[in-house]
UniProtKB/Swiss-Prot annotation:
Homodimer. GO terms for biological process: 'de novo' pyrimidine nucleobase biosynthetic process; 'de novo' UMP biosynthetic process. Coiled coil: none annotated. One of its GO terms (molecular function) is zinc ion binding. It catalyses: (S)-dihydroorotate + H2O = N-carbamoyl-L-aspartate + H(+). The modification N6-carboxylysine is found at K100. GO terms for cellular component: cytosol. The gene is pyrC. Belongs to the metallo-dependent hydrolases superfamily. DHOase family. Class II DHOase subfamily. Zn(2+) 2 binds at K100, H137, H175. It comes from the Bacteria. Substrate binds at H16, L17, R18, N42, H137, L220, H252, A264. This is Dihydroorotase.
């Protein structure tokens, strides 16, 4: 088994950078590894049109480390009021690459989200016409639905109908967490893909709940039972081009996570590709990592693959206990624990 792994530089097809002073930290972490990233728009207020996306993009670019060529790929936040004109203007901007469907209340800052998918059918039709993907947080959020069943219910109630109603629409089923979602994407037409996070490949709900509640494993969609984790590993390491890397790295200040009502989100951007390498190594599938991390995503979006490379080496190191996050700190996933792979910063 090789102790050195060289890949085409990967992209992150789902990340949260937040806004304001924290960008100096979050942008540096993602730019360390990734050439491009799909930037989630769930700010307060959300990124609802091309003008707001352009302003957010400029703030991200201003926070890039010196010499960085990292490219943020901007996303619109769909609301009940998003119009086809908003979609067409976003496409014409040249820097908005997708639109995001958050069911209202599904995750952090999603209160402005869509109350009924039927309300945005005209906007979805415009997405299909322009070729822009629809990114879907696939959970039903009604109070009577068990939190562990939200994803499957979304497939049954909405996802099948959405794909059938808009057969030419590119759809990314984001951060899938269940065997049901993996099977749905596998069996769906070629215009349906999915991102998978590192935490859902490496962990299941036992890691979060057994022996004490571990808030830094809490994210949405929530970690599921180990049988779903196995199905996600099967999908990610299969070589199927429908599945690609999306960290859903989502930082919150320490005090907001370690609280009586803690926020959802795992911070993985600081060591994302290293964590994915561990997951793929568990399956003896390191040869499949480059496709998942560096090829399938740009191919799905119709963008060129990166041409430069990164190199990982098998070299154990200890993750930091905390990282700066504006005036606060963020506790990264695996804080204080050993990681088995290390990114060569100089790519030597």
């Amino acid at each position: 088994m090789s102790d050195r792994l060289t890949l085409l530089r990967p992209d992150d097809w789902h990340i949260h950078l937040r806004d304001g002073a924290v960008l100096q930290h979050t942008v540096g972490d993602v730019a360390r590894t990734f050439a491009r990233a799909i930037i989630m728009p769930n700010l307060v207020p959300p990124v609802r049109n091309a003008l707001e996306a352009g302003g957010y993009r400029e703030r991200i670019l201003a926070a890039r480390p010196a010499g960085s060529r990292f490219e943020p790929l901007m996303v619109l936040y769909l609301t009940d009021r998003t119009s086809p004109e908003d979609i067409r203007a976003a496409k014409a901007s040249g820097f908005v690459y997708a639109a995001k469907l958050y069911p209202a209340g599904a995750t952090t800052n999603s209160d402005s989200g869509v109350t009924s998918i039927d309300n945005i059918f005209p906007a979805i039709e415009a997405l299909a016409e322009t070729g822009m993907p629809l990114l879907v947080h696939g959970e039903v959020t009604r109070s009577e639905i068990d939190v562990f069943d939200r994803e499957k219910r979304f497939i049954d109630e909405h996802m099948r109908r959405l794909v059938e109603r808009f057969p030419t629409l590119k759809v990314v089923f984001e951060h899938i967490t269940t065997a049901d979602a993996a099977q749905f994407v596998t069996e769906a037409p070629a215009n349906v893909g999915a991102t998978i996070t590192a935490q859902h490949l490496l962990y299941n709900r036992n890691h979060m709940l057994v022996g004490g509640i571990r808030p830094h494993f809490y994210c949405l969609p929530i970690l599921k039972r180990n049988t779903h984790q196995v199905a996600l590993l099967d999908a990610a390491t299969s070589g199927n081009p429908k599945f690609f890397l999306g960290t859903d790295s989502a930082p919150h200040a320490k005090h907001a996570k370690e609280a009586a009502c803690g926020c959802a989100g795992c911070y993985t951007a600081y060591a994302a590709i290293e964590l994915y390498a561990e997951a793929f190594e568990q399956r003896n599938a390191l040869d499949k990592l480059e496709g998942f991390a560096s090829k399938h995503g740009p191919d799905f979006y119709g963008l060129p693959r990166n041409t430069d490379t990164i190199t990982l080496v098998r070299d154990e190191w200890t993750a930091p206990d905390s990282l700066p996050f504006g005036d606060n700190t963020v506790i990264p996933l695996r804080a204080g624990e050993k990681l088995r792979w290390r990114l060569l910063e100089d790519n030597a």
